[in-house]
């Protein structure tokens, strides 16, 4: 999703963009939104490098952006030998021989990158100001904070492997300040919880289940608060200034949930595998729903940290690295 958002930012600057995908679902998705894609699914790493080099000679390719946990240091260096390469790094990978590192996460440690890349000429784009969000989140202001919470959003991102959205929805139905509120569950395209959520909705008219929702920013802004996993959706909620309770769906989200809470951008509802997960979600939800002042503070902090302009900033910075004089192809 963030690669699509970044590609759209490049297109807005008059740059031609194409994709090279090593997963079949990636090829399908990229083509569905109107971009060309090279299918690398059946190729080894070495053959992938050769295919990219053959398809886009160095005199026609200005820049490469790589985004996958599976890329090795040698693979990224091979890409960098074709054209200046930027790596979107979530894992604080040390000492890559490439042209730029992008880490726009709330957990991004600028001091780590400064130390580990001290001897490198790589451009470092670190911190939430470089978080890549879809264009619909650009320039959003914080939502109006009402005296009472009337609409709550529940989301677990693209999937729901632990059935977190089910447990959270059942918990919210027991929260006293939400007795008269609408609960909107935004199920991701890979969620296996939809049928159970629809059963809950059938018995509780206050619960609405949406899957593959369009205009997500508008949906978020229609809600007074949210319960969200500590992934990309949480960054989008911050850009809209929606006060939230954040939770971890996976080990790599625990630190992010803590960081959102530590920066007073959300309340930390714990991890889905915690034995007290439901009670923590209930306590945090009631605390946030009861206090307009707390919601106001969290809303402003979140919106200030994620302003939705990260994709444009990253595109601008990376174009400065482009080798071709016209900087026309990424």
Predicted regions and their residues:
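C-terminal "capping" alpha-helix adjacent to the active site of nucleotide-linked donor transferases
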Residues: 276-293
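Donor-nucleotide binding loops and adjacent catalytic segments primarily
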Residues: 140-141, 146-223
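Active-site and donor-binding regions of nucleotide-sugar-utilizing enzymes
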Residues: 2-11, 15, 19-119
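C-terminal alpha-helical cap of glycosyltransferases
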Residues: 307-330
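Acidic donor-binding loop of glycosyltransferase active sites
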Residues: 221-233
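A nucleotide-sugar donor-handling region in carbohydrate enzymes
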Residues: 97-163, 194
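Conserved donor-binding/catalytic loop of nucleotide-activated donor transferases
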Residues: 221-224, 238-247
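A short, well-ordered alpha-helix in the C-terminal region of glycosyltransferases
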Residues: 287, 293-308
């Amino acid at each position: 999703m963030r690669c699509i958002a970044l590609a759209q930012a490049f297109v807005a600057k008059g740059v031609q963009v194409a994709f090279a995908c090593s997963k079949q679902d990636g090829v399908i998705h990229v083509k569905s939104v109107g971009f060309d894609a090279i299918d690398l699914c059946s190729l080894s790493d070495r053959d992938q490098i050769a295919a990219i080099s053959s398809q886009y000679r160095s005199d026609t390719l200005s820049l490469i952006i790589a985004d996958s946990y599976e890329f090795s240091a040698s693979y990224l260096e091979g890409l960098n030998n074709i054209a200046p390469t930027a790596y979107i790094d979530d894992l604080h990978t040390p000492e890559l021989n490439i042209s730029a590192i992008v880490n726009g996460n709330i957990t991004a440690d600028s001091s780590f990158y400064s130390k580990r890349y001290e001897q490198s000429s790589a451009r470092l784009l670190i911190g939430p100001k470089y978080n890549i969000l879809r264009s619909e989140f650009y320039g959003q202001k914080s939502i109006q904070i009402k005296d009472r919470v009337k609409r709550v959003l529940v989301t677990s991102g693209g999937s729901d492997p632990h059935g977190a959205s089910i447990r959270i929805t059942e918990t919210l139905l027991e929260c006293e300040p939400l007795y008269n509120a609408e609960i909107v569950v935004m199920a991701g395209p890979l969620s296996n919880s939809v049928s159970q959520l629809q059963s809950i909705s059938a018995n509780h008219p206050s619960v609405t289940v949406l899957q593959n929702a369009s205009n997500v920013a508008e949906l978020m802004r229609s809600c007074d608060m949210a319960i969200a996993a500590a992934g990309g959706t949480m960054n989008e909620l911050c850009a809209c200034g929606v006060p939230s309770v954040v939770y971890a769906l996976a080990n790599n989200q625990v630190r992010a949930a803590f960081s959102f809470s530590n920066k007073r951008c959300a309340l930390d509802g714990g991890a889905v595998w915690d034995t007290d997960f439901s009670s923590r979600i209930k306590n945090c939800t009631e605390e946030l729903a009861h206090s307009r002042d707390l919601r106001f503070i969290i809303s402003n902090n979140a919106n200030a940290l994620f302003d939705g302009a990260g994709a444009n900033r990253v595109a601008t910075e990376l174009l400065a690295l482009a080798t071709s004089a016209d900087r026309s192809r990424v």
